[in-house]
Amino acid sequence: MGSGAGELGRAERLPVLFLFLLSLFCPALCEQIRYRIPEEMPKGSVVGNLATDLGFSVQELPTRKLRVSSEKPYFTVSAESGELLVSSRLDREEICGKKPACALEFEAVAENPLNFYHVNVEIEDINDHTPKFTQNSFELQISESAQPGTRFILGSAHDADIGSNTLQNYQLSPSDHFSLINKEKSDGSKYPEMVLKTPLDREKQKSYHLTLTALDFGAPPLSSTAQIHVLVTDANDNAPVFSQDVYRVSLSENVYPGTTVLQVTATDQDEGVNAEITFSFSEASQITQFDLNSNTGEITVLNTLDFEEVKEYSIVLEARDGGGMIAQCTVEVEVIDENDNAPEVIFQSLPNLIMEDAELGTHIALLKVRDKDSRHNGEVTCKLEGDVPFKILTSSRNTYKLVTDAVLDREQNPEYNITVTATDRGKPPLSSSSSITLHIGDVNDNAPVFSQSSYIVHVAENNPPGASISQVRASDPDLGPNGQVSYCIMASDLEQRELSSYVSISAESGVVFAQRAFDHEQLRAFELTLQARDQGSPALSANVSLRVLVDDRNDNAPRVLYPALGPDGSALFDMVPHAAEPGYLVTKVVAVDADSGHNAWLSYHVLQASEPGLFSLGLRTGEVRTARALGDRDAVRQRLLVAVRDGGQPPLSATATLHLVFADSLQEVLPDITDRPDPSDLQAELQFYLVVALALISVLFLVAMILAIALRLRRSSSPASWSCFQPGLCVKSESVVPPNYSEGTLPYSYNLCVAHTGKTEFNFLKCSEQLSSGQDILCGDSSGALFPLCNSSELTSHQQAPPNTDWRFSQAQRPGTSGSQNGDDTGTWPNNQFDTEMLQAMILASASEAADGSSTLGGGAGTMGLSARYGPQFTLQHVPDYRQNVYIPGSNATLTNAAGKRDGKAPAGGNGNKKKSGKKEKK
């Protein structure tokens, strides 16, 4: 037994012979276990060893899973020892009230196999309630004419305990005039009556103060007191008399409040005030259910009666006359049961979750039905409502099992509302429903699904490292870890070592972050393969592709390719004939931008001009043309400051300075050049070393070429091939394009032949007159070098050679009217004996053709060896061909296309230039 229970808590198995006989016919009849314990046992107290009483061994307990199934959790079973323990407070008065016998009945459930055992625990009363009076004081009026032996009913006390622990005795404080008698009602409750021992004399003493004590026989006994104030009144020698000492009446529990129960009557032989009778309840507790008319004695129902709560009422009435004398009677009210209680459905042993892969017939819950009515009004049947994958099986009397009846799928129905309806057999029958919600547990049977089949995101270059560039989302209809999705990068078209330095992804949110600033010029797009994986076991996953497009920003300023500084850092100049008409193409500013799109769309603007209005600049082409003819007052040397802006926001720009000289020949320019101061000795020395280095490289190159040609001719064994070899010197300079533009989007490349010297002496290169069309045009008599603007103390003057007629366009070859001059074949051009001036014009032509892309200059066979392999990203479809307007000092002819050279014809003016070169050598 548990603590405090003693032998009273000892298990008492009640073998009965007739149960044994019945068991022969009913083998499935369950055995009932009885225990007796006192109330108010502490939580955890042992009621008895339920496992032992049921015949279970300790080894069977883990598999049998013995537990208690009851409406309220008063008891629990220890999983280790099988002992029945008290789990909540046991208050007998709260559980059973004044019932003489109090017992709790419940079922003990054992699994494997499933069995039910009826357990009865009788709760014994302890003396835990003190008798209490309904009032702390009573006032009693007694006539002085009252005779000794007259009895007066006093207010009774109430004790919630039963048996010996309830109210047993009343005691009155010692008095010469009064004594006390204990009386008992028909229901067993006791009440006190005070007896007058000696006559009273109002003139001697008007009142008396007594103490009434109520005692029980508990251990230890408890008591309470009430004060009695006795007032002595004048004589009234006749007390009221009821027509009956006891009234009995039967009343249905469904009567409405206000219904008359009965009417009592009383008479008084006195007259006047002493004969005026008033009725009242002797106990205040009776006024909760009934009402009494104090004048007529009519008793009516005050509140609704309930057979299940109280089956019988015992009411004590008092009749008091005007003189203060009273009489009492008892009214016994029997309550008749009606079918006024609907059955109740109580679910027990409910699981938290039912896994969606549960098998058919899986036990889900235990439910009980209860009806407070008696006899056939309390017999109940129940059924399951709705179309649900469950069914109800009868387990025992008023006990049912809920089991699965179909396959469950949480994704279709994550929960079920189960409604069980119970109906009794009363007339009319009553029914009630009880609903519970069963939650279906998840199984990882769904893989994550991305919101899109693929993702494409645009990211502007120069983004801050760590910035969010995109977010992918995947959903998983599963719950808990089965539906928790994490993200990772599975693959990419980047190098594996570089992947972590480019992007990363948040495993929780799917946000993709840039780990570095992207550069559109280096990386324009890349693709990632992302994976979403749930946390189930085994885990399920899905992949999706994310393509990242790096958008361009205007982060590169334009770069001017032409005009460029000379090899010695000096500025170059362009010559314009004096006779240039308005619209004459002077030169072209060539610039590139490493950006793309509108960020690389360049425009050209004149910021400053020494003679405003003399030249015009193409907004998109960068072509510098004469806006009017040269005036007498115009300076020979002109300077233009040109700004090149891109189309970005904000736009970036670069500037270039053009030096233009109006002259028909180089002779006119040389005096102006000689006026300039000599460069410093350091620069002259540097130029000297550069010239020596170039000369050595050229000599080595020529020697290698001569040896290669000689070997080839010897192998061919053709003497005629040796006659084509002429001693000469061909030099090809390095590209003037900045190195960083070799990988840009819009770079240009030019091949220049420049005479480098620290002095003003001009050096010319000679080549054989019979050059093939595939050779560099610089291998002729003329030198095509651009002259840097530098000082020289020694200048050699040369006469201008006659025009080279082979450099003219035929009528069919002319580009049209885009130039400013007519371009007829007989047009007069200034003569020039220096072939280097022709090269300057060719560079201008190639610069213009870099944007055209369709010219024969800059790459084809028979061209001047100028490579226009770079062009702007935008194509000027209608850029005019200005080759016919390019001024070539020393020649009045326009440029000839490559077709003429492919015919193998040498220029007509070549001999003249060669002769001039010979004169220079002689000098």
Curated annotation (Swiss-Prot):
InterPro entries: Cadherin-like_dom, Cadherin-like_sf, Cadherin_C, Cadherin_CBD, Cadherin_CS, Cadherin_N, Protocadherin/Cadherin-CA. Residues 1-30 form the signal peptide. Residues 31-133, 134-242, 243-345, 346-450, 451-560, 568-673 form the Cadherin domain. One of its GO terms (cellular component) is membrane. One of its GO terms (biological process) is nervous system development. CDD domains: Cadherin_repeat (cd11304). Residues 913-923 have a biased composition (Basic residues). Its main location: membrane. It holds the Pfam family Cadherin_C_2. Glycans are attached at residues 417, 543. Residues 31-689 are extracellular. One of its GO terms (molecular function) is calcium ion binding. It is found in: Cell membrane. It is a single-pass type I membrane protein. Keywords: Calcium, Cell adhesion, Cell membrane, Glycoprotein, Membrane, Repeat, Signal, Transmembrane, Transmembrane helix. Residues 711-923 are cytoplasmic. Residues 797-832, 893-923 are annotated as: Disordered. SUPFAM superfamilies: Cadherin-like (SSF49313). The chain crosses the membrane at residues 690-710. Potential calcium-dependent cell-adhesion protein. May be involved in the establishment and maintenance of specific neuronal connections in the brain. This is Protocadherin gamma-B4. The gene is PCDHGB4.
